Structure formats: structure tokens, C-alpha cells
Amino acid sequence: MITPQQAIERLISNNELFYDEMTDLMRQMMSGKVPPEQIAAILTGLRIKVETVSEITAAAAVMREFATKVPLENAEGLVDIVGTGGDGAKTFNISTTSMFVAAAAGAKVAKHGGRSVSSSSGAADVVEQMGANLNLTPEQVAQSIRQTGIGFMFAPNHHSAMRHVAPVRRSLGFRSIFNILGPLTNPAGAPNQLLGVFHTDLCGILSRVLQQLGSKHVLVVCGEGGLDEITLTGKTRVAELKDGKISEYDIRPEDFGIETRRNLDEIKVANTQESLLKMNEVLEGREGAARDIVLLNTAAALYAGNVAASLSDGISAAREAIDSGRAKSKKEEFVGFQPQQRCHFLGKMELG
């Protein structure tokens, strides 16, 4: 067993922690056995040294171990559409909009998200703004997935052990390992994923982490300029995990007949209300940059979820889901499912 002090000494000497050591240390932190000042030192040491694939994998495995899981008989076909955040782009909720389009095209989406930390509007903020209930029990989330094809898991409801580290990570003022752990710890166990990251280096790193964690089909993407989505402004780096193997490549909007934009100004928003307005415009079929970026990201989600055979097929399916009105109806179905009785979970707690 490694003590927090031993871990700190290893990290400040620029030495990595072995998998078993990181597992043990993470369990101590998630159990409330490590004082805040030592948590701060550990997170700082990991950031300065740079977290390894092994360290991230161990930490994610422990977070999954401590999570309150969604009880599903079969999670095999589930796909998560999620981003790390931290890109500072202030775009509308692209992945949340894509959730409705993907579900309308036949995907089973188990989306894991929280409130805004660095963006104009977090996934949970916009889901709440549209009138949905964030505080579903795990059983109700499972029922939502079965009935509507969508389940939204508000992160604090499923990661109560984060209360031991959340105040420290918020106070640090810089990214820590926890910024990338959230997207790796889907409580429904979705084996397929479209994961947006804020730096191209993370594409290869997190695809290897998810490979070790047993994921099946994953696209880890980083748009030009550090956007944690597939972008419209140029190339997007993709690390794809499929059939146990990882391949890396670049894609561009014009590869799929979509116009490359000079900037993302058309899809930037100032708050949750503006984000929901932009989402509704897309779901109602309005042409423009917002629709195009949703088409690209939905296509990737459909491909990752094995609903589409390729990204090009995914574009066609996404376009048809919007133009037929099914994507708009899917959103209404999702919001309408939510039970009126609120459950007293940890709804006010933030993961970060």
C-alpha cells in the first residue's frame, strides 16, 4: 500500500506511479482518507509530471468502481457523446444536440454530463433549461434509455465520492486528471463513445486508456485549435478504437461535402438560453454552421455506436433524422418522459 506522502515524493521526483499504486491512492482519495492539502499536492504533481496512460486507466477504473451505476440488462449497443470541455470555445451544446439526432437515427444514447465549468453552457444546464429532470434515479435513467433511446446521467448523482476531492480541484485553478476522468466513467457502462478532447495529444492517450478499460468502438476527436468536437474550421484529429486496434487519422468537413468555415463565430453563445435556441434551430431544420457541425458529430456518434457503417453513412442518417422532424420529436419525447416527482440526489454538487 502506498501512502499519500510516498506518492507525493514519487511525483515531485518526476517518477510515475505504477497501476496498483495509483489504484490504491485513488481509492484512498475517493474514500475521504486523504486530507485536502495532500490531494492538492498529488493533483499538482501528476499535472507537472504529466499523467501516463497507466495512471489515467487506474484512476478511471476506481471512479467506475465507486460510481452509482445504471442497471441495464445489456449495455452492448450504448453510445456516449461527451467532451472533456476546457476548450474555451463558447460554442452551443453540440454534443447534446447530437444526442437527439443520433437517437432519432436509431442509436441508444447514454450521455454522461455535468454543469458548465469553462463553457457558456454545460450539458446538464441545457438539459435542465429545456425542462427535463436531471435528478432521475439510476432505474429511471435505464427506463428512459429503453423507452426513448436516451438516458442523461447527471454526473454528481452518480459520483458521490467526488465530494472528497471536488472542492480541492475547483480551488486549484488549473486542469487536473479529473478533467479527463469524467468522460471515461460512464455509469451505464457504454462501450461505444464519441469523446471530444481539448488537445490532440489526448486522442492517442485516451484511446489507449479506453482500450485497456475494455471499450469496443471509440472515436476520440480534437478539432483544429483545440475544439473538443469535430470542427468546421479545418482538420480534426481522430483516434479510433475498433476491433481492439487503434488507428489515427485526420478528417475535414469537405471530406463529407460540408463547407469549411473560417471561424466558429456563428455557433458561439453567451449563455444556456442562447444555446437552447441554437439547438432548437438545428432540430427544426435551419441551415447553417450549427446544423453542419451537428451533422458531423452525430455522424461520428452513429459510426461509433455501430448504427452507421461509415462517417459518410452517418452524415446521411443524421440529415434524414433532422429533415424528417424525428430529431425534434425525439427531444420532445425525452423531455416528456421525465417523472414529475424529483428525487433527492446530490443535484447541487458539481464535479468541477
UniProtKB/Swiss-Prot annotation:
Catalytic activity: N-(5-phospho-beta-D-ribosyl)anthranilate + diphosphate = 5-phospho-alpha-D-ribose 1-diphosphate + anthranilate
Residues involved in 5-phospho-alpha-D-ribose 1-diphosphate binding: 83, 86-87, 91, 93-96, 111-119, 123
Example of a GO MF term: magnesium ion binding
Cofactor note: Binds 2 magnesium ions per monomer.
Keyword Amino-acid biosynthesis among record annotations: yes
Keywords linked to the UniProt accession: Amino-acid biosynthesis, Aromatic amino acid biosynthesis, Glycosyltransferase, Magnesium, Metal-binding, Transferase, Tryptophan biosynthesis
Name of this chain's protein: Anthranilate phosphoribosyltransferase
Origin organism lineage: Bacteria, Pseudomonadati, Pseudomonadota, Betaproteobacteria, Neisseriales
